[in-house]
Amino acid sequence: MARLSPLHLRVQCAIRQQQLLHPGQRLLVAFSGGQDSFCLLQILRDLQPRWGWQIFVLHCDHRWSADETECARFLQGWLQQQGLPHAVETADPIRRDEAGARAWRYQQLEKWARTWDCSAVVMGHTASDRAETFLWNLLRGTGAAGLSSLDWQRHLDDRDPTSAQVVRPLLGLYRWETEQFCQQHQLPVWPDRSNQDLAHGRNRLRLEVMPYLKQHFNPQLEAALNRAATLLQAEHELVVAQAAQLWPQVYEPALPGLRRDPLRAAPLALQRQVMFQFLSLVLPHHPTFEQVEAGIQLLKADRGSRSPDYPGGHWLEVKGDHLVCFH
């Protein structure tokens, strides 16, 4: 076996410490052809003899530009040359919408994870991505869940605990490190020209805002944001766990509603988490902060009080000791 570099050892250490992957697993690698995914794929291939993994690769072509289609053709040829089991999925023409594109990619990942019987979907997000995501979500307005959303692992489908695990072994590396690795190993990285388009807010944040903040406020900005995300993740997990313990005492599925007395006695952070979970069950979409707060206000309101209308014609109303959802 070839000797592992310090970078290989750091990733292998993260895999073990975070319990991301196990020997003999079938892995589906989400492969864009950029420097992070090339670095990820090469490290996994180098570690493969020690771990006994079976590696499969999926590339998704959104067809937003001729460059993307050319990239897909190039990567397919390279993957064939490398003898790697792979698939290239091509989207129907869709408008340039990041949320829609992400949903489509995850659908393809679910499909191919089932097809190849892969228990883990491996993604190349780095600490630089985590810092960028933290700041982006903070500027848009979000809670602890959004600020700590890019974690080491999660289920591919949040609603299905049997779905494959999404794992991110490179979260301990920064973007400059994956770039250096690709150069050292002469990997044929495909530059994504769309990443330079300042019409997209995320690109402007990465190319202009974060360098400005590094220069004028904190040269270690990415490390600072990663620390904040890590701390918030642990605190959010604690609140979610405590809310799960409180849930059977307050939730009345037959109504559907919540018992006000035990929920009113809980700390505000738990009230908000339980209210968020309840509204997520009864509304067509996850509730906003304002919608959660409207529900919280009713915990101390007089009988007969009701909330403003929620999406889908729902509202909450105080009925005795219960807060009931009507439709």
Swiss-Prot record:
Recorded superkingdom: Bacteria
Lineage: Bacteria, Bacillati, Cyanobacteriota, Cyanophyceae, Synechococcales
Biological source species: Synechococcus sp. (strain JA-2-3B'a(2-13))
Domain-related comment: The N-terminal region contains the highly conserved SGGXDS motif, predicted to be a P-loop motif involved in ATP binding.
Function: Ligates lysine onto the cytidine present at position 34 of the AUA codon-specific tRNA(Ile) that contains the anticodon CAU, in an ATP-dependent manner. Cytidine is converted to lysidine, thus changing the amino acid specificity of the tRNA from methionine to isoleucine.
Gene from which this protein is expressed: tilS
Protein name per the record: tRNA(Ile)-lysidine synthase
Keyword set, alphabetical order: ATP-binding, Cytoplasm, Ligase, Nucleotide-binding, tRNA processing
One GO cellular component, as annotated: cytoplasm
Catalysed reaction, written as an equation: cytidine(34) in tRNA(Ile2) + L-lysine + ATP = lysidine(34) in tRNA(Ile2) + AMP + diphosphate + H(+)
Binding site for ATP: S32, G33, G34, Q35, D36, S37
CDD domains from the UniProt entry: TilS_N
Recorded GO MF terms: ATP binding; tRNA(Ile)-lysidine synthase activity
NCBIfam families given in the database record: lysidine_TilS_N
Gene Ontology biological process terms, A to Z: tRNA modification
